[in-house]
């Protein structure tokens, strides 16, 4: 059982003792704490809400994910959704489109993309070169990691920049499209990231979403699950409790944090640190050099998101697309959160999220909220004039840190972070294969299972 010592002396720090302290209440932290629910566990979260980059706004029959867009993958995330009976809206039959020159073309149809969109022959040749370089590598990324050829290709991609797909491409349109795709799916520029993650995202998500396991939109949005997990944990999740330091010895950890009542300290046998890489470096000053180097190799995509609830009636030209790429606009993509609901008779209304990532997000960060929303609203109506008078005020989110990625060669340091630091275990979507919500959940559960094994039976 937890023990608490209260001390009202101003110069003294309140102290508690627990078996396990989890730092961070994003998907990884919540899944870790859920796995440890039968033990004496407490979760410290700096912000005023649980869920981390999972953020959903709801209204009536619709919802908008203004953080992480989709749920996909296998493992603990999908298991938890099924266990809690969260309905998963299928995206089967939905695809990604490109809006260009007033036309909307399905990107999974190469012929239509090349010849039905308004491109010059130079643009078509440039895009063909880009597509060939991406698709030639995708099959190797889909193979088992035990495959020798797959490992060779992955190693090569890990050590080259993603903008290799633009080598020799003179078409400004093709170059703009690649930057737009990189921004919308990864939140970075192609020259910032190693090619592996870029090729995977572009080659599978963009051209054939049905290849992605369990690509779904959970009913009520991605936040439905994090809300359930946080509610089940109850007051063991402490919001508004930023951690200042995590220190450890072979025998346990000491976590200094602050809450509304002032400075506080938790002593625990084990800790799970489930925060972004830069925060981990900040709160763990005693990191060994190799761990610090590995954390510093992790970069994050950044986004500006504006969500719009809409009031249209009848079938619309975006209904069959889960996303529409929009090069040339203030946002790079529109994600259609009502896509999974478009079965049978179409209900009135809708839910769209407009995204800008990478360098475009950096520029938007310099603007005020009203200016960003005004630009996105104007461009949404430019894209879909039929929505004039049917769009509610935009819901803005600024995300300076979302999808983890690595520069060429940077991912080689990741193995270091997969080993515990004595009683401190790490969790996060950066630890597994391709960063995703599913990887965050799996990482949290795996960290908790290692903690349980180290604690032994009660």
Question: Which role fits each region the language model picked out?
Answer:
Residues 2-15, 31, 252, 318-458:
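Conserved flavin/dinucleotide-binding core of flavoenzymes
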Residues 14-15, 239-352, 359-365, 382-383:
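Mid-domain catalytic core of redox enzymes
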Residues 19-43:
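N-terminal Rossmann-like FAD-binding beta1-loop-alpha1 element of flavoenzymes
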Residues 37-59:
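Glycine-rich FAD pyrophosphate-binding loop
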Residues 61-140, 151:
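Dinucleotide-binding Rossmann-like beta1-alpha1 core, especially the glycine-rich loop
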Residues 78-100, 172-179, 297-300, 315-318:
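A short alpha-helix-loop-beta-strand transition element characteristic
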Residues 139-253:
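Active-site/ligand-binding neighborhood in enzyme catalytic cores
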């Amino acid at each position: 059982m937890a023990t608490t010592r209260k001390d009202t002396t101003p110069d003294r720090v309140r102290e508690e003792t627990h078996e396990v302290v989890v730092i961070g209440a994003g998907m990884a932290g919540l899944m870790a704490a859920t796995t440890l629910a039968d033990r004496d566990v407490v979760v410290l979260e700096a912000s005023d809400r649980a869920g981390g980059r999972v953020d959903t706004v709801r209204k009536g029959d619709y919802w908008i994910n203004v953080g992480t867009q989709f749920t996909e993958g296998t493992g603990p995330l999908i298991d938890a959704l099924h266990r809690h009976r969260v309905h998963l809206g299928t995206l089967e039959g939905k695809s990604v489109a490109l809006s260009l020159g007033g036309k909307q073309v399905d990107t999974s149809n190469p012929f239509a993309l090349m010849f039905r969109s308004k491109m010059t022959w130079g643009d078509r040749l440039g895009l063909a070169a880009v597509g060939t370089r991406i698709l030639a590598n995708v099959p190797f990324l889909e193979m088992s990691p035990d495959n020798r050829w797959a490992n060779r290709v992955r190693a090569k991609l890990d050590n080259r920049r993603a903008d290799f797909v633009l080598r020799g491409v003179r078409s400004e349109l093709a170059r703009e499209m690649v930057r737009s795709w990189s921004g919308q799916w990864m939140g970075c520029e192609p020259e910032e990231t190693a090619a592996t993650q870029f090729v995977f995202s572009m080659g599978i998500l963009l051209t054939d979403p049905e290849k992605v396991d369990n690509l779904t939109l959970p009913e009520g949005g991605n936040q439905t699950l994090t809300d359930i997990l946080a509610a089940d944990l109850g007051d063991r999740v402490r919001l508004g409790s930023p951690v200042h330091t995590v220190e450890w010895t072979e025998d346990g950890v000491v976590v200094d944090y602050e809450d509304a009542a002032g400075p506080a300290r938790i002593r625990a046998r084990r800790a799970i640190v489930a925060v972004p890489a830069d925060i981990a470096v900040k709160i763990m000053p005693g990191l060994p050099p190799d761990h610090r180097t590995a954390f510093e190799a992790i970069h994050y995509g950044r986004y500006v998101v504006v969500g719009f609830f809409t009031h249209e009636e009848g079938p619309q030209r975006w209904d069959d697309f889960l996303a529409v790429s929009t090069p040339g606009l203030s946002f790079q993509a529109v994600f259609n959160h009502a896509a999974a609901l478009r079965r049978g008779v179409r209900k009135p209304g809708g839910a769209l999220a407009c995204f800008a990532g990478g360098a475009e997000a950096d520029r938007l960060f310099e603007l005020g909220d009203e200016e960003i929303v005004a630009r996105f609203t104007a461009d949404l109506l430019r894209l879909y004039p039929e929505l004039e008078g049917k769009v509610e005020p935009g819901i803005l989110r600024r995300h300076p840190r979302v999808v983890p990625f690595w520069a060429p060669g940077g991912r080689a340091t990741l193995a270091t972070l997969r080993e515990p630091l004595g009683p401190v275990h790490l969790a996060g979507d950066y630890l597994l294969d391709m960063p995703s919500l599913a990887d965050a959940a799996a990482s949290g559960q795996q960290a908790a299972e290692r903690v349980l094994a180290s604690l032994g039976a009660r």
